[in-house]
């Protein structure tokens, strides 16, 4: 499955980047393709392109702040608190698989 994700926490420091790493590791274990955009204290990094969005199966927004979803129109979007990704990254991805079947 091709997953695009955004991680963002209120401070934009640690959890944003830890969640990114946890999602990447879980996706690798499950055989998924993933790209994670971070919206942290230093701004947006690894920004998702329109082409990547078009090719994605699902968009995962793991954020405790507001994320603009306009660019994801027509795509399935799953929103989940960043704390869930921090604790259960593989479980979050498994739930997405279930919803997409």
Segments predicted by a language model, with ranges:
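Short, well-ordered beta-strand core segments
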Residues: 59-60, 77
